[in-house]
Structure formats: structure tokens, C-alpha cells
């Protein structure tokens, strides 16, 4: 059995770590709430522009933008949204597993893969795993700006317009609730009709100045807004996952301290018993 002094040292060390994890949990709670507010603020725009684009796709306007035309898939692009920091449980690993599974399906069909990686963890993963990373950005901070993302997104959009990729996906975590974050792979382009929103309103649209000018700008904004929303939502997922991870670490530290305290008490009791026995034995010898 370890000595009392050694056990006291371990208890002190774990208590110090527990204070750190407890503080990190509280910080994550605060950051998660702010991220949720940003996520909620961006959702109406992202959802509304998706509805408008969906209606345009279903309505089959005279001008068919390349983003709305299906073609044979020879090369696939993924915009991967990961975190810059760790200590958030299996958030990134679960996301990468979903991505690798989806990539494997296309590779089996003979398609090549191009990657645009957002976040340091994604860049680190693909350095080890391998992959053709054509664009990367990291350290966007707690309040990412859409302007910071435009350059990397444009690389993938230009590749699609030039025929270098035939399908583009965004891969990120969806915020279900504080306890649940779901990795998702969503197709950005070509646009697919949303059956849930199909012709809810049988409206006819008049395009000014014309459908081509409208769609050329609107579709690019659509992709940018979806990627931005994915980044904001992934940040909320990161903070929620970190909060849970730090809470579990704090609770585990408490249990470990209790176990060590019990061991310490037993060791101390054994030492006292031994001292008493030695005193009694010495007195008897006298």
C-alpha cells in the first residue's frame, strides 16, 4: 500500500486538476450559450434562402445555373468543418468517421476526392490519414466571420464551375441539444429538391432584372451561408461537447479523490495501529 504522504500528494494533485476542469466547464457553458445565440440568429436566413433556392429548383426556371445541373460524378469535394481545439470528447472523431465512410462509398465507384478543411483538428487528421486538401483555414475564433470563409469556399465553387469536381458536400456537426451532437454530410451542390418543402405555396415569381442575374448571385450566397451556418453550429457543438467532457472529468476526479481519501484513511489507521502495537510491545518488554 502506498504511504500516507504519497497518497496526500496524489489527492492534492487531483484536486488541482479538478479545479481546472471545473473552471473549463463553466467557461464552456458561457461560450456555448453565446454560440447558441449566434446559431439561432443565423438559422432564419440560412433556412429561408434554402427555401427560396428549393422553390427555384422545383419551379425549373428558364435559366439553369450549373449549380442546379446533375452530372456524372467523377470527382467529389467535401468542405469539412472541425474544431481548432481538443478536450471536446469524441466530437471530431465521430465526424471524421462519418466522412471517411461517405468518402469510401465514392472511392468504390472510382471517384476522386478533394477536401477543403476548416479547423486545426481536421487539418491534423488529414495529414495523418491522407487526402487531397486543396484549401484549409483555421483559428477562426469564437465569433467566425463569413468573410473569413469566402476564400476557401470560392476554391471549391470555382472547382465545380470549371468541372474539376462534380458534387460538393459540407460535413459538420448538427446541434440537436446540449447532450447530443450529430455528425452530418449534406450535399450543397448540385442543389437537390427538398420534398418536405415542395410547392407549399403555388406562387409564380417575377425575376428582376432577370433569373440569370438573380441566380448567379443568390446561389453563391446560398453556399456561403450554409457553410457559415455549419461553422457556427459546429462551434456550439464543440462548446457543448467540451462542457460535458469537463463535467465528466470533474465528477471522475471527485470519485477518485473519495477513493484515495478512503485509502489514505486506511493507511493512516494502519500506521497508528502499528505505532500503538510497538508502544504496547515496548512497555511489555520493560
UniProtKB/Swiss-Prot annotation:
Any single GO molecular-function term of the entry would be: ATP binding
What domain of life does the UniProt record list for this protein's source?
A: Bacteria
Keyword check for Cell membrane, yes or no: yes
| GO CC terms in record | plasma membrane; proton-transporting ATP synthase complex
Q: Which residues form a coiled coil?
A: none
Family annotation (Pfam families) = ATP-synt (PF00231)
Cite the entry's keywords alphabetically.
ATP synthesis, Cell inner membrane, Cell membrane, CF(1), Hydrogen ion transport, Ion transport, Membrane, Transport
This protein's major location comes to: membrane
Tell me one GO biological process term. Answer: proton motive force-driven plasma membrane ATP synthesis
Asked whether the keyword Cytoplasm is assigned, the reply is no
Annotated localization: Cell inner membrane
Q: How does it sit in the membrane?
A: Peripheral membrane protein
Tell me the protein family, please. Answer: Belongs to the ATPase gamma chain family.
- Protein purpose: Produces ATP from ADP in the presence of a proton gradient across the membrane. The gamma chain is believed to be important in regulating ATPase activity and the flow of protons through the CF(0) complex.
Describe its assembly: F-type ATPases have 2 components, CF(1) - the catalytic core - and CF(0) - the membrane proton channel. CF(1) has five subunits: alpha(3), beta(3), gamma(1), delta(1), epsilon(1). CF(0) has three main subunits: a, b and c.
The identity of this protein, by name, is ATP synthase gamma chain
